[in-house]
């Protein structure tokens, strides 16, 4: 038979020769060792800091396991000889076990013969192979006394066997104050080796196992690996708490029952992620009928099986994918090539035909997803206890799988629509490829109707994979330039002499409140000379209107309309309405008495009357005036200046003889109009802000339909202020309001004036008293 061979093996970053089985166990049970050492192998836990006594059976299971391969068994036999005479019987027993595997142990034939043992040791020292070096270390450790063993064991680090050296030190309890610094050096070597490949192992090495505080029974059950026994105990515990809450219909009880219901769905989702679908059925059967009627209302009880089969199918596709980043899960638990149950056979295809059953399936899939995303337990619980370190990645994978399952249900028969395809944007390219391959294999052998459904799913995935779907909130660089012109582009427009009211004089960003004064430059006409409009920008343009061109007469006559405001009437409620209001639980119509207060019907009527009483008559007048049609004005190029008739001959208007009825303030707008005495970018002054301010960049007072004007009375302002009284305002100021039609004096406003459409310096037209210095306006 062949002699045993020695060499360094690696298990997920852990290099070892003597403790190969231990290295494999640790790499596969990191979470268990870190969070629940009492449930782990006691010898492995003691290596990482557990103070619990070591069970000899646990140690032997790691040294000479019954199912080990020949190399691992031979390495464990070396350990039995190095750990002391008490393990010699186990070494002898393993010789026969190794022989059955077709191997012999080279030390077993010389262990009882000192001469042969020494001769083998000397012969080994002459060899330079890695295998010989490992055997040399074995002879040195075996031959040294206890006080010298630490140094002999430390030499294993030169062979890249730092893990074996650390385990020997722990197993033989060689660590003390004198060699503490040397032990820390060995740990540093391990940290450096594991830092990139296995960070959780580094955490376990540095922090040690958690000597768990006592936890409640329920949390203890949730931390155990999933079995039928632990699942049954957990379900029964939740049922007991749920049943105690059933008699109470208060809000607090409803919240508790909602949380407990999510705990049921968490256990169901855990079975699907664990690839133990049949245990999901156990969850439903263990729940008694009164509780089940609430947890699975309506059709959800009937379609629970279909929801479980669909969720399990898609989750397992994601779990077993070769692109799965959770390597430990992919390698140890799942396979992407497993067969799945036919959807028609399990009734899922029939449920797809009914929209109400599809709706119930969708609700259950949403509950599955919520149960793993939200914190449904008092203490943190991983979806798969053995893989707590990968819990976040695992939850993301499961929720994506459930989201795709929900897509299949919600977009049944509309899978290839544009909206349906856009909903698949949450899947990455590799996931779509995997799903296409899986469903392509799955549809083989199905009937025609099932094949049509699966082909629509595949077609939608292929279209989503090939076409670039862009989010509504994403724009290309060119689109951004088109939708949001920069300040530099606005400046360029000004420099080229653009005269539109939106662009003229605008050389600052659109969000800036900086005002640029423009002295008596009308934005509606062309500039004949260059103008400095601020910020070092000059506007230069050619006047396209010749001086000899005459203006056509303006013959439009505005017609006055009068509309009587309608008085609002309050219709008293009927007796039926009063009784319904009295019987209602709350004013908002919801069955939530703890969150609403009943408001008596009489109080509601009184409140409405008070609000109507506070409204001035002018408001009602304004409402009726808003319906007055405005005569169509002739184009500007046909207008001609005409002399307005004397005040006595002026026709009455809808406002009466000089009636200066105030109007409601209009909503301020962002009108970037720049003109001599007209609108400006931001109305500022002494009065109420109007829709457009007066000249000199600001007008204040005289906001639209009311307010006392400031230095440049606003358009249509009441009691227009100085230097440009408001249009349609009473008491116009030094210059009448805008829309004056080029009146005389300082700019007499139209319909403005002193008291009754007059004007201090340019009587407005249609006004009562004329201004002090004439210059009457149009009409």
Curated annotation (Swiss-Prot):
Keywords associated with the record: Developmental protein, Differentiation, Endonuclease, Hydrolase, Lyase, Nuclease, Oogenesis, Repeat, RNA-binding
Catalytic activity: [RNA] containing guanosine + H2O = an [RNA fragment]-3'-guanosine-3'-phosphate + a 5'-hydroxy-ribonucleotide-3'-[RNA fragment]
Entry EC no(s): 4.6.1.24
A biological process from GO: oogenesis
Cofactor detail note: Does not require metal ions for catalytic activity.
EC class (word): lyase
Record field: compositional bias (Basic and acidic residues): 612-626
Region: Disordered, residue numbers: 563-596, 611-661, 718-779
Compartment annotation: Cytoplasmic granule
Region Involved in dimerization: start-end pairs: 203-464
Region (RNA-binding RGG-box): 699-772
Compositionally skewed regions (Polar residues) per UniProt: 584-595
Superkingdom as given in the UniProt entry: Eukaryota
Record: active site: 453 (proton acceptor)
Keyword RNA-binding: yes
Molecular function GO labels: identical protein binding; lyase activity; ribonuclease T1 activity; RNA binding; RNA endonuclease activity
Role played: Guanyl-specific endoribonuclease which cleaves the phosphodiester bond in single-stranded RNA between the 3'-guanylic residue and the 5'-OH residue of adjacent nucleotide, resulting in the formation of a corresponding 2',3'-cyclic phosphate intermediate. Essential role in male and female postembryonic germline development; maternally provided protein maintains a population of proliferating germ cells and zygotic expression is required for correct oogenesis. Together with the P-granule component pgl-3, is involved in the formation of P-granules.
Oligomeric and partner information: Homodimer. Interacts with pgl-2 and pgl-3; this association is not required for P-granule localization of either pgl-2 or pgl-3. Interacts with ife-1. Interacts with prmt-1; the interaction is direct. Interacts with nmad-1. Interacts with P granule components meg-1, meg-3 and meg-4.
Domain notes: The dimerization domain also acts as a hinge; changes in its structure probably impact oligomerization and RNA-binding.
Protein name as catalogued: Guanyl-specific ribonuclease pgl-1
